[in-house]
A protein has these predicted regions:
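Hydrophobic, small-residue-rich alpha-helical packing segments that form membrane-like cores
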Residues: 14-111
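Short intrinsically disordered, low-complexity coil segments enriched in acidic
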Residues: 1-3, 97-98
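Short alpha-helices
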Residues: 87-143, 150
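Hydrophobic helix-and-loop "lid/oligomerization" segment in the mid-to-C-terminal part
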Residues: 2-54, 122-238
Length: 238
């Protein structure tokens, strides 16, 4: 199982392609949905990339040992989750359901929560046009099946406007493959079904990487190639 909707990873990956940011990503490969990031993950998968900042989506650190290791390696931490917890963290921990958080909207999807972080960073760095990523945020929120009220409802409503006119080559290829010209809930479900990893754990990880490439590529032909591959992969055998 993947605890984080990879649409959220795609959004973060695409949005963070600023000239001064060198962004890498790691798809979480564990079947155990309760597993957290441990010291081995940090040493072998994260420090290996020379990371200065680790942003985790839906996966927390296992213990204070991991926090200490990140401090020793000069890796700053931002963890995004949305679940009830009373444990205090010594790092940036964004969770509307943590004890003491006064944020009004407690049922934000992880995608919506990521978008809130994007908004805050965009304001700080005076970055423009982050709303164009609402197409991906919409897909993640719809996949999570969150209540369509509050900020989730606003994001889904606005996201539909960006999705139908998306400039994302991957989403556009998927929509054209499914002959989607008008957007409704059934159309969104079709998109989600095509770009949701399936199969064994290994197969899911490999497909998730391919899907990630689909959603961040700037090559129209490559997007069409991947979308057709995914379509044939999921097409029932006759």
């Amino acid at each position: 199982r993947f605890r984080c909707p990879w649409q959220t990873v795609c959004t973060t990956r695409r949005w963070a392609k600023a000239p001064w940011w060198n962004v890498e990503y790691l798809i979480y490969e564990e079947e155990d949905a309760k597993k957290s990031i441990d010291c081995n993950n940090i040493k072998n998968d994260i420090d290996f990339l020379g990371a200065d900042l680790l942003i985790t989506l839906g996966v927390d650190l296992k213990s204070e040992s991991e926090v200490k290791l990140c401090n020793e390696l000069d890796i700053d931490l931002i963890v995004l989750e949305n679940k009830k917890t009373v444990r205090e963290r010594s790092y940036v921990y964004i969770n509307p359901n943590q004890k003491g958080c006064q944020y009004r909207y407690k049922n934000l999807s992880l995608s919506a929560l990521t978008f809130k972080l994007m908004q805050a960073i965009a304001i700080y760095y005076n970055l423009k046009s982050i709303n164009k990523y609402l197409d991906l945020i919409l897909i993640g929120a719809h996949w999570a099946k969150v209540p369509l009220k509050g900020e989730n409802g606003v994001i889904i409503k606005e996201g539909k406007k960006f999705l139908i006119n998306t400039n994302n080559y991957g989403l556009r290829a998927v929509m054209e493959l499914n002959n989607i010209v008008e957007l409704d809930d059934n159309s969104i479900v079709k998109i989600i079904e095509l770009i949701t990893p399936t199969g064994s754990t290994v197969g899911m990880v490999n497909n998730a990487r391919i899907i990630l490439e689909l959603l961040i590529t700037n090559d129209k032909d490559r997007a069409e190639q991947i979308s057709k591959y995914l379509y044939n992969l999921k097409k029932p055998e006759e």
